[in-house]
Regions:
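Short hydrophobic alpha-helices that are characteristic scaffold elements of the AMP-binding
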Residues: 35-40, 62, 177, 188-189
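ATP-dependent adenylate-forming carboxylate-activation enzymes
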Residues: 24-25, 42-60, 72-77, 172, ...
């Protein structure tokens, strides 16, 4: 799928060094598109799905984005600025149904392209991605990363959490963020499976871990707290799920109360636990 995306982008005039934006919710197409962009030598530019129309317009111009992949959730926000953003820019719709008039349909366009690998040479010193950080004030700040940094994040994460081929990573946070993607990179480099989950309710998370046989789960503090509250109230029962294979729970992106981890260990004493800290500027978690 990534190769088809890359061939499609080359056919549509994308060249090494171009910037290609991704404005999509977590979905099966997200990662093939991301790697398809990288395979062309262009820079992938993930955008925060919470951005309002003016922030989207700002980021498109700041990063000099010439192509934008977007999902159905963003049609309204893009329509509001379509007159400003369609000039000299290709917009590609990724989703079901008919595409908006200002875009072309990705699935219909890319499905017949070759799945063969491209012969485009890319080095660690080539730029590979631009990520946006919220900063402390004003509009988002752009951060430029090389392919070597992306590769380093794979090795760093795998060394940190010890992913192996038989591990299954449950990815809940948004893929536009360096945290979610770089945690997933540990699975990528080890050949392990990843499961994308839309939903943060305790029963939804536990069901996914059980049915998909997940071994590693990255949670945020509110999600972990909700699971503990649901267990304490009896709203969910551990015995209803197959969780023996779940070996690691880690949390990041915010301070983690000591009591939360102590309470977690009461219900999941066999879990390894890790508190993550990372920055978009340093290409994700450490």
């Amino acid at each position: 799928k990534a190769n088809r995306c890359a061939h499609y982008l080359l056919e549509r005039g994308v060249h090494p060094g171009d910037k290609v934006g991704i404005l999509m919710m977590n979905c099966l197409e997200w990662l093939p598109i991301y790697f398809g962009i990288l395979k062309t030598g262009a820079l992938a530019v993930p955008l925060n799905f919470r951005y309002a129309s003016d922030e989207i317009d700002y980021c498109l111009n700041l990063a000099d984005i010439s192509v934008l992949f977007f999902g159905p959730e963003f049609i309204g926000r893009l329509e509001a600025i379509s007159d400003k953003i369609i000039a000299h820019r290709l917009l590609i719709y990724v989703g079901e149904g008919h595409e908006p008039t200002f875009s072309e349909n990705y699935v219909m366009s890319a499905m017949n392209y070759s799945s063969e690998n491209l012969n485009i040479e890319i080095s660690d010193d080539d730029y590979g991605a631009i990520y946006f950080s919220s900063g402390t004030t004003g509009f988002p700040k752009a951060i430029l990363h090389k392919h070597g940094a992306l590769m380093h994040s794979c090795a760093c994460e795998q060394n940190h959490h010890g992913q192996k081929k038989d591990d299954v990573f449950l990815c809940i946070p948004p893929l536009y963020h360096t945290g979610a993607k770089m945690h997933w990179f540990g699975s990528l480099i080890s050949g392990g499976k990843a499961v994308l989950l839309r939903g943060t309710k305790p029963e939804t998370i536990l069901k996914a871990v059980s049915e998909e046989k997940c071994t590693i789960v990255w949670l945020l503090v509110p999600w972990a707290q909700d699971i503990l509250v649901a267990l304490e109230k009896g709203d969910v029962n551990i015995k209803d799920y197959h969780l023996d294979q779940w070996r690691l729970m880690h949390i990041g992106a915010q301070p983690v109360p000591k009591k939360l981890i102590e309470d977690w260990k009461k219900y999941f004493p066999h879990h390894d636990y890790d508190t993550n800290y990372g920055l978009s500027e340093s290409i994700g978690p450490g």
